[in-house]
Amino acid sequence: MAILIPERFAHEMTDVIRLIPEDEYERGYCTCLDTISEAEINSLCWRAIESIDKKTIRQFLGSKYCNIDPDYWYNKLVELSTIPNHPFNADYFHALMMRFTMPKRDGRFQFFFNGCAGYDDNRCANPLRRLIDWAWSENVSVKADPESTRLAAVMLCWLLSSTYIKHRDEATKALVNLLSEQVEVLIETLR
């Protein structure tokens, strides 16, 4: 439903939340809100780009109805980061990061960068780890399209600010591998 409602009817799934009477909100609708929140955020990976209402999603994220942990949202942004023309790709993440002063940015994101560039308890790669592994894979610089490469590079460049040396080193090596055959993208990324 989180995919069909926006694509067929041009409404976000979060519009359903408005149907919950305000006085009923506290009576056990938290589970419903959790489900709707997760469905809305997870649908961003699968929906047609033109069906995503960026303004509505951003308003929802800042509302009392959103039950999404910030790290969950940041992980989703990493997953979306390499999709060209997606409203929440690496260009969005870059603009989000640039709004903060360096101390606020470091205070807010260092734990995310340091904790989310590895593996979870089940040994599944977190989104940043998957991005590093992909950018570090053989022949990726030849195979990847220039726009996805640029977006991946923008995202990986933010990992260079990590206080964790291992992640900084891996991001550096992944960037070198990713951009080795795409000099134009390297120059554009540095601008």
Regions found by a protein language model. Give the residues of each.
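Alpha-solenoid HEAT/Armadillo-like helical repeat scaffolds in large eukaryotic proteins
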Residues: 64, 80, 99-100, 155-160, ...
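Flexible loop/turn segments at the boundaries of HEAT repeats in alpha-solenoid HEAT proteins
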Residues: 89, 141-146, 177-187
